[in-house]
């Protein structure tokens, strides 16, 4: 079944993308952001706590943290990972996270890795400079961060957007849009952000 129709067009906007070598300092509590985080674990192990559950992250896995989700990070040794931070929006609708089943964690394929590497090649100057979420996840210019660094041709822009959509699609379970319902108390805040972004 189709996810989208003429009333719902999915839009994804990349904010940050890069490769990070996390150590024992990768322990941050009470993190909540207006954007989502996608990870591909390369080496090592760590953990993320969200939705009252512990997710153990290990090499070769894809993992996603939806926007407006309280979570915590924990790393006892090291974890090297690729990441993409992005906004999602259903134009004419709501956040896709509120309207479909999401698989948060699963094994990555070789194609997933190739797509991630190509995406970072296309967006090579958009890495997070300071890994502490307090320094970047709620800054005033969050909706335009790194946009001045993304200066590629139309064909590469389409390729970049297509790769992000492909990777994001891997997390979707039930491909039929569910009846709108709030997953957390920040849905109203998310709508405000979407309104500001569109006006």
Region spans (language model):
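Double-stranded beta-helix
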Residues: 89-107
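Short acidic, gly/pro-rich beta-turn/loop elements at beta-sheet edges
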Residues: 27, 48, 83, 93-94, ...
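Generic protein-terminus/edge-of-domain signal
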Residues: 1-61, 69, 75, 102-103, ...
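Short, Lys/Arg-enriched, Trp-marked, Pro/Gly-tolerant hinge/linker segments that flank
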Residues: 107, 127-139, 145-199
């Amino acid at each position: 079944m189709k996810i989208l129709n003429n009333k719902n067009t999915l839009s994804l906007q990349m904010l940050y993308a890069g490769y990070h070598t996390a150590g024992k300092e990768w322990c941050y509590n009470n993190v909540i952001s207006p954007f989502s985080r996608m990870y591909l674990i390369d080496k090592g192990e760590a953990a993320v706590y969200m939705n009252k559950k512990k997710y153990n992250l290990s090499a070769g896995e894809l993992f996603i943290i939806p926007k407006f989700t309280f979570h915590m990070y924990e790393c006892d040794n090291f974890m090297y990972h690729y990441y993409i931070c992005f906004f999602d929006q259903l134009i004419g609708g709501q956040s896709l996270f509120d309207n479909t089943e999401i698989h948060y964690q699963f094994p990555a394929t070789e194609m997933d890795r190739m797509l991630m590497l190509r995406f970072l090649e296309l967006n090579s100057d958009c890495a997070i400079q300071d890994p502490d979420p307090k320094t970047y996840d709620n800054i005033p210019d969050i909706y335009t961060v790194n946009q001045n660094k993304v200066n590629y041709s139309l064909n590469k822009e389409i390729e970049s957007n297509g790769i992000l959509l492909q990777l994001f699609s891997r997390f979707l379970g039930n491909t039929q849009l569910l009846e709108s319902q709030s997953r957390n108390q920040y849905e109203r805040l998310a709508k405000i952000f979407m309104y500001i972004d569109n006006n």
